[in-house]
């Protein structure tokens, strides 16, 4: 079992739309991108998260269908929000390491001090753009449509 499988299992079982709305495709391993797209399409079409059973019927791709059956078979007790944080942390760490590796390989010996500092700042800004570091202030799900009597 991996974190992505556990996360998707919990989100779908608990119908946790709040966690799902904070999920980005790039937080998940590439093997899960097709499944992410299918779940997202279902949400846009029906305005709700699919169940695992819905996905078993809707998806025809064998690889993705096998992934759904594997996700369905696991037993998870962790909260979706916590699992999402783990996914974001893992993604962020990989991005930082990849960016620093690229920086060391291509720039470090050719830049002066100011250029090096600016390059490192740019790496931080790029990663901040890719990862939501703060929780959204308001969710449309929490805004009441009508005022209480």
Identify the function of each model-found stretch:
Residues 1-90:
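Noncatalytic partner-interaction/assembly domains of nucleic-acid and motor enzyme complexes
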Residues 16-17, 45-48, 93-96, 109, ...:
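Intrinsically disordered or highly flexible coil/loop and linker segments, enriched in small
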Residues 38, 42, 58, 70, ...:
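Charge-rich, solvent-exposed alpha-helical interaction surfaces
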Residues 47, 56, 71-74, 101, ...:
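Short, flexible coil/linker elements and helix-boundary hinge sites characteristic
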Residues 80-83, 93, 116-121, 129:
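Terminal low-complexity, poorly structured segments
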Residues 82-113:
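A charged, amphipathic interaction segment
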Residues 105-127:
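Non-catalytic interaction/clamp surfaces of large macromolecular machines
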Residues 125-149:
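The Walker A/P-loop phosphate-binding site
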């Amino acid at each position: 079992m991996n974190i992505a499988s556990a996360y998707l299992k919990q989100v779908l079982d608990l119908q946790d739309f709040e966690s799902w709305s904070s999920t980005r495709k790039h937080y998940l391993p590439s093997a899960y991108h097709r499944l992410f797209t299918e779940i997202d399409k279902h949400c846009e079409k029906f305005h709700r998260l699919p169940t695992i059973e819905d996905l078993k019927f809707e998806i025809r791709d064998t690889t993705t269908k096998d992934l759904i059956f594997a996700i369905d078979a696991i037993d998870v007790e962790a909260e979706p929000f916590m699992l999402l944080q783990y996914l974001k942390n893992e993604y962020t760490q990989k991005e930082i390491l990849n960016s620093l590796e690229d920086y060391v390989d291509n720039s470090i010996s050719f830049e002066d001090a100011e250029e090096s500092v600016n390059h490192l700042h740019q790496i931080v800004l790029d990663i901040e753009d890719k990862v939501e570091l703060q929780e959204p202030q308001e969710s449309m799900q929490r805004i009441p449509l009508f005022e209480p009597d």
